[in-house]
């Protein structure tokens, strides 16, 4: 070695690179996709578990994409006495079922320097941009009409809840939804005929997997997500307990 030259500790660089890679990996959000319709309650318990993990920095932001089997739920404003499943989200009654694309957002608002309204607007923008790709004009609404609308019909419902600094629940986009299922309730405190779907507007069914992929792209852009982990059909019990999906 010539005088004045310094040696480089390559082992230190190697360890540092590994550590840096781990940090980058851990800060990548998780996109969880369920490819068959899911029962509602197990997924509700799953969300609650993920919120606790997110608040304790055990997981990163998580986006859950799925369809549900037929179910009716009601948010904190509902005052009825029937057997509808009560949940923590805002809003009134709604229906979930096959043909409806649901996304749950487990987001740490503090880390993203956002508030609840910021999140709702990002969800709305993601949906509007997705529908625009399919030549469906839509617009966001807030307050008692929170969601995304086409003309005078509601195509996407939005309702979130916050525990600690993290959110759960999210949005439901009617793709090929059987709209007659809304007839037994007052969806979002409106008449059942207020609801519409991509299929009804366009006069044809859509491939819900393709719509999901387009929505994922819109969400990535809106939330400035450059990289992500994708997991499919995860174990609702094992996920987040130190087990890889």
From Swiss-Prot:
Organism: Picrophilus torridus (strain ATCC 700027 / DSM 9790 / JCM 10055 / NBRC 100828 / KAW 2/3)
EC number(s) recorded for this UniProt protein: 2.3.1.181
InterPro entries per the UniProt record, alphabetical: aa-tRNA-synth_II/BPL/LPL (IPR045864), BPL_LPL_catalytic (IPR004143), Octanoyltransferase (IPR000544), Octanoyltransferase_CS (IPR020605)
Localization: Cytoplasm
Miscellaneous comment in the UniProt entry for this protein: In the reaction, the free carboxyl group of octanoic acid is attached via an amide linkage to the epsilon-amino group of a specific lysine residue of lipoyl domains of lipoate-dependent enzymes.
GO biological process terms, semicolon-separated: protein modification process
PANTHER family with a match to the protein in the record: LIPOYLTRANSFERASE 2, MITOCHONDRIAL-RELATED, OCTANOYLTRANSFERASE
The organism's taxonomic lineage, starting at the top: Archaea, Methanobacteriati, Thermoplasmatota, Thermoplasmata, Thermoplasmatales
GO terms assigned for molecular function: lipoyl(octanoyl) transferase activity
Reactions catalysed, as given in the entry: octanoyl-[ACP] + L-lysyl-[protein] = N(6)-octanoyl-L-lysyl-[protein] + holo-[ACP] + H(+)
Principal location class: cytoplasm
Protein name: Probable octanoyltransferase 2
């Amino acid at each position: 070695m010539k005088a004045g030259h310094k040696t480089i500790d390559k082992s230190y660089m190697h360890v540092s690179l590994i550590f840096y890679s781990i940090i980058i990996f851990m800060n990548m959000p998780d996109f969880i996709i369920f490819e068959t319709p899911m029962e509602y309650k197990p997924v509700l318990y799953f969300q609650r578990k993920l919120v606790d993990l997110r608040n304790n920095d055990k997981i990163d932001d998580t986006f859950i994409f799925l369809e549900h089997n037929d179910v009716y739920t009601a948010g904190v404003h509902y005052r009825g006495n029937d057997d509808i499943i009560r949940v923590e989200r805002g809003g009134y009654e709604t229906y979930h079922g096959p043909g409806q694309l649901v996304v749950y957002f487990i987001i740490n608002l503090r880390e993203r320097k956002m508030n609840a309204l910021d999140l709702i607007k990002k969800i709305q923008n993601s949906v509007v941009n997705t529908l625009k790709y399919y030549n469906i004009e839509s617009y966001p609404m807030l307050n008692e009409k929170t969601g995304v609308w086409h003309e005078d019909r509601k195509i996407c419902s939005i309702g979130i809840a916050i525990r600690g600094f993290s959110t759960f629940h999210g949005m439901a986009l009617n793709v090929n939804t059987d709209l007659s299922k809304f007839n037994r309730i007052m969806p979002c405190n409106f008449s059942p005929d207020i609801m519409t779907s991509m299929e009804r507007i366009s006069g044809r069914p859509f491939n819900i997997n393709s719509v999901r992929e387009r929505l994922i792209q819109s969400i990535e852009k809106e939330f400035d997500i450059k990289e992500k982990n994708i997991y499919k059909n995860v174990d609702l019990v094992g996920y987040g307990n130190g087990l890889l999906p």
